[in-house]
UniProtKB/Swiss-Prot annotation:
Residues 391-410, 431-479 are annotated as: Disordered. The modification Phosphoserine is found at S557, S609. This is CAP-Gly domain-containing linker protein 4. Residues 455-479 have a biased composition (Low complexity). One of its GO terms (biological process) is cytoplasmic microtubule organization. It comes from Homo sapiens. GO terms for cellular component: cell cortex; intracellular membrane-bounded organelle; microtubule plus-end; nucleus. Disulfide bonds: none annotated.
C-alpha cells in the first residue's frame, strides 16, 4: 500500500493537518511514503541538512514538514544527520506514522535507517542503540526487508559492523532469524555479509549469538570462504589484511570439527623459518631483489608478520617508492627511511641480475644492446605448427629450400607471420630477442653473397630456418619468441597509449629488458632519457618506458595498417587478436597457414572478437550493470551499477561501485538513489571517465539509454 491508497480520515483537531492532509494519527497499516526532496533553508551555506543549525531546526520541528521530507533528510549520509537519528525519527513518529512505514525511494523503515546510523565514523552507536530499542518496543518488525536490497535490520547491522545493534535485534528475535539469508549476497547469512566486508566486531558478535559458521550460500561457501585473501590485498591495506587473518581464524575455529573445511583453509607456512624459506629460494638477507619485475631494493627481512599469514619479505627500496619505514601496525620488522620500505609475498620477489652494470648506453640503439650469443640448437627434427610452404622432410632439403628464397621473399614470410601472431612478448627471453635481431641482417647478407657456404653448415642452416619458422623454434628453444616487436613499429602501451618503438634493451633504472616508446600525444614521462642516460630522443613528455608484457601491436597486419584512418589510430585497442578481413584476396597457402594458426591459438581469442566493421569493436560491446571498468582519474577498478540519465545533469552517466573507499557517496546523489553500495564506495561519472579493456567508455554506451 502507498500513501495514495489510504482511505479518508477525519482531519478535525489535528494540528499537523493542513498543507499535508495525508498525515494521520496512529495508523495501524504500514504505508510507503512518496519520494520528496530534503527541505533546506533559503540562506543555507552548506549542501546538507544540519539538525544543529537554527534554521534547519526550524524546518525540522515545523509541523508542516512532511514525512517524505523527513525521510529525505535521513537519506543524507553525513554525521550531522546520522548522529541525530533519534531526533529526526521521533519527528516522523510524532506525525502519527506507523513504526513500520517505509521510505518510497529506498523502501527502508526507520529501523533500517537506525541500523545504518550506527556505522563507526559516521553515526553514533549509543544513540542508534537507544532509538532501535525504542522502535522495537513500539512494534518495529525486525524481519522486514528492503525490496531494493532484500536486506533486513540484522543484515544492515552486520554490513555496517555494529555489534551493539546486532545484540538488540537478536534479543527479541527467533533463534532461526540469526541465519536469515539475503539474495544480494548469494543467499548468504549475516555472518557471510560481515565476513566478506571484514567486519570483525559483527563476526564475533554473531558467533556469540549462535550464528552458524558452517552455513553454505548458493555457491557452496561457508563464511570463512568469503573472507578476502590477505595475499591479494594491496600492500597499503596492511591493517585490512590483519583483520582478514583474524576473521578467518575466528570463523575456522568456530566451525564444527565434523564439517569438511579443507576448502576454507589456506596453506600455512608460519611454522617454517624465514631463513629456511630464503635458502629454498637461493636468497639471503642483504641480497639485491626485484619486486614483481618493477621495483628494486635490498632484502632486509623475511618471516611471519602480524598483518597477514604466510611468509613475507621486507625490502628497502632504492627509490622512495615504498609504503613505510619498515614497520606496519606499530610493529617494526626492519629499519629504513620513510617511504623506502615495502613488504611483498615471497612469490613476488626474485634476485636482481647484475649484468646491466657493464653496459654503456648511448642514443644509438645498437650500442645499447649487448652482444649475447645463445646455444646453437638443431631444430631440424621439429615440425612447425605454422605451414610456411617450406619443405621439411629432410634436413638438407629444409636448409636448401630455406636459403634458396630471395631475400625479399624471406623478409615477407617473416613479416606476415609476425603480424598474424598475437603481439604478446611477455614470455620471450631477452637473450633470444637480441640474438634474433642481430643475426637476422647477417643471415640476409650471407644468403645473397654465398648460399653454398651457408648450406654446408648444419647449425647455421638450422638457425636460418628458425628465423622463418619461429613457432617450430619456440618448441625447441623457450627463449625464442613469436610475434616479436621491432624498432619503428606502432604499439599500444598498457592498453591505452599509442606510440612508436624507439629503443629496446637493458637500462640503468631497472633490471630486465625495456621498450622505449615515443608516444603520439604528450602523455609520457620524459624525453627518452632517465637518470641522465639518453636511451632515445623525442620531445619532452612524449617518451615512456615499459616492460615487454605491457606492450602490444596496434593492428593485425601491415596490409591493413595503411588503411586505418587517423581517427581510428587514436582509438584504444584491446589486448586481443582481431579476425582477418574476409574481403582480402588470399592464396590457398595463406588460408591453410591462417587456419593452422587459428586452431593452435584459439584459447587466446576473446569470445567477443569478430571481424572489424566500420564502427570497430566498440559497436559490438556495451557497458551494462556488472561490467568491470577502470576509473582513469583515480586508477581504481569498479563495477558498473547504473547506466542512464540523472537529475543533476543531462546526458548519460555511469554509477560505479569502487573496490576501495575512494568514492563520493553510497549510490545516491542529493535526494535520489541510483544504486546501493557501501559508504564512500559509490561515484557517478561520465562514460568518458572510464575504460573497458582499453576502450573509452564513451564509445560503449547508448546515448538513448
Amino acid at each position: 500500500m502507498t500513501i495514495e491508497d489510504l482511505p479518508d480520515f477525519p482531519l478535525e483537531g489535528n494540528p499537523l493537518f493542513g498543507r499535508y492532509p495525508f498525515i494521520f494519527s496512529a495508523s495501524d497499516t504500514p504505508v510507503i511514503f512518496s519520494i520528496s526532496a530534503a527541505p533546506m533553508p533559503s540562506d543555507c551555506e552548506f549542501s546538507f541538512f544540519d539538525p544543529n543549525d537554527a534554521s534547519c531546526q526550524e524546518i525540522l520541528f515545523d509541523p508542516k514538514t512532511s514525512v517524505s521530507e523527513l525521510f529525505a533528510i535521513l537519506r543524507q549520509w553525513v554525521p550531522q544527520v546520522q548522529q541525530n537519528i533519534d531526533i529526526i525519527g521521533n519527528e516522523i513518529l510524532k506525525r502519527g506514522c506507523n513504526v513500520n512505514d517505509r521510505d518510497g525511494l529506498t523502501d527502508m523503515t526507520l529501523l533500517h535507517y537506525t541500523c545504518k546510523s550506527g556505522a563507526h565514523g559516521i553515526g553514533d552507536v549509543e544513540t542508534a542503540v537507544k532509538f532501535a530499542t525504542q522502535l522495537i518496543d513500539l512494534g518495529a518488525d525486525i524481519s522486514l526487508r528492503s525490496r531494493w536490497t532484500n536486506m533486513n535490520a540484522l543484515h544492515y547491522a552486520a554490513y555496517f559492523d555494529v555489534p551493539e545493534l546486532i545484540r538488540v535485534i537478536l534479543k527479541t528475535s527467533k533463534p532461526k532469524d540469526v541465519d536469515a539469508t539475503c539474495s544480494d549476497f548469494n543467499f548468504g547469512t549475516a555472518l557471510h555479509i560481515a565476513a566478506y566486508n571484514l567486519c570483525a566486531g559483527a563476526v564475533k558478535c554473531l558467533l556469540e549469538q549462535g550464528a552458524n559458521p558452517a552455513f553454505r550460500n548458493d555457491k557452496g561457501q561457508i563464511p570463512a570462504d568469503v573472507v578476502p585473501d590477505p595475499v591479494d590485498m594491496p600492500l597499503e591495506m596492511a591493517d585490512a589484511a590483519a583483520t582478514a587473518k583474524e576473521i578467518k581464524q575466528m570463523l575456522l575455529d568456530a566451525v564444527p570439527l565434523s564439517c569438511n573445511i579443507s576448502k576454507a583453509m589456506l596453506p600455512n607456512y608460519d611454522h617454517v623459518t624465514g631463513k629456511a624459506m630464503l635458502t629454498s629460494l637461493g636468497l639471503k638477507l642483504g641480497d639485491r631483489v626485484v619486486i614483481a619485475g618493477q621495483k628494486v631494493g635490498t632484502l632486509r627481512f623475511c618471516g611471519t608478520t602480524e598483518f597477514a599469514s604466510g611468509q613475507w619479505a621486507g625490502i628497502e627500496l632504492d627509490e622512495p617508492e615504498g609504503k613505510n619505514n619498515g614497520s606496519v601496525g606499530k610493529v617494526q620488522y626492519f629499519k629504513c627511511a620513510p617511504k623506502y620500505g615495502i613488504f611483498a609475498p615471497l612469490s613476488k620477489i626474485s634476485k636482481a641480475k647484475g649484468r646491466r652494470k657493464n653496459i654503456t648506453h648511448t642514443p644509438s640503439t645498437k650500442a645499447a644492446v649487448p652482444l649475447i650469443r645463445s646455444q646453437k640448437i638443431d631444430v631440424a627434427h621439429v615440425t612447425s605448427k605454422v605451414n610456411t610452404g617450406l619443405m621439411t622432410s629432410k634436413k638438407d632439403s629444409a636448409s636448401e629450400s630455406t636459403l634458396s628464397l630471395p631475400p625479399g621473399e624471406e623478409l615477407k614470410t617473416v613479416t606476415e607471420k609476425d603480424v598474424a601472431l598475437l603481439g604478446s612478448v611477455s614470455s620471450c627471453s631477452s637473450t633470444s630477442s637480441l640474438e634474433h635481431r642481430q643475426s637476422y641482417p647477417k643471415k640476409q647478407n650471407a644468403i645473397s653473397s654465398n648460399k653454398k657456404t651457408m648450406s654446408k653448415s648444419p647449425s647455421l642452416s638450422s638457425r636460418a630456418s628458425a628465423g622463418l619458422n619461429s613457432s617450430a623454434t619456440s618448441t625447441a628453444n623457450n627463449s625464442r619468441c613469436e610475434g616479436e616487436l621491432r624498432l619503428g613499429e606502432r604499439v599500444l602501451v598498457v592498453g591505452q597509449r599509442l606510440g612508436t618503438i624507439r629503443f629496446f634493451g637493458t637500462t640503468n633504472f631497472a633490471p630486465g629488458y625495456w621498450y622505449g616508446i615515443e608516444l603520439e600525444k604528450p602523455h609520457g614521462k620524459n624525453d627518452g632519457s632517465v637518470g641522465g642516460v639518453q636511451y632515445f630522443s623525442c620531445s619532452p613528455r612524449y617518451g615512456i618506458f615499459a616492460p615487454p608484457s605491457r606492450v602490444q601491436r596496434v593492428t593485425d597486419s601491415l596490409d591493413t595498417l595503411s588503411e586505418i584512418s587517423s581517427n581510428k589510430q587514436n582509438h584504444s585497442y584491446p589486448g586481443f587478436r582481431r579476425s582477418f578481413s574476409t574481403t582480402s584476396a588470399s592464396s590457398q597457402k595463406e588460408i591453410n597457414r591462417r587456419n593452422a594458426f587459428s586452431k593452435s591459438k584459439a584459447a587466446l581469442r576473446r569470445s567477443w572478437s569478430s571481424t572489424p566493421t566500420a564502427g570497430g569493436i566498440e559497436g559490438s560491446v556495451k557497458l551494462h550493470e556488472g561490467s568491470q571498468v577502470l576509473l582513469t582519474s583515480s586508477n581504481e577498478m569498479g563495477t558498473v551499477r547504473y547506466v542512464g540519465p540523472t537529475d543533476f545533469a543531462s546526458g548519460i552517466w555511469l554509477g560505479l561501485e569502487l573496490r576501495s573507499a575512494k568514492g563520493k557517496n553510497d549510490g545516491s546523489v542529493g535526494d535520489k538513489r541510483y544504486f546501493t553500495c557501501k559508504p564512500n564506495h559509490g561515484v557517478l561519472v561520465r562514460p568518458s571517465r572510464v575504460t573497458y579493456r582499453g576502450i573509452n567508455g564513451s564509445k560503449l554506451v547508448d546515448e538513448n539509454c
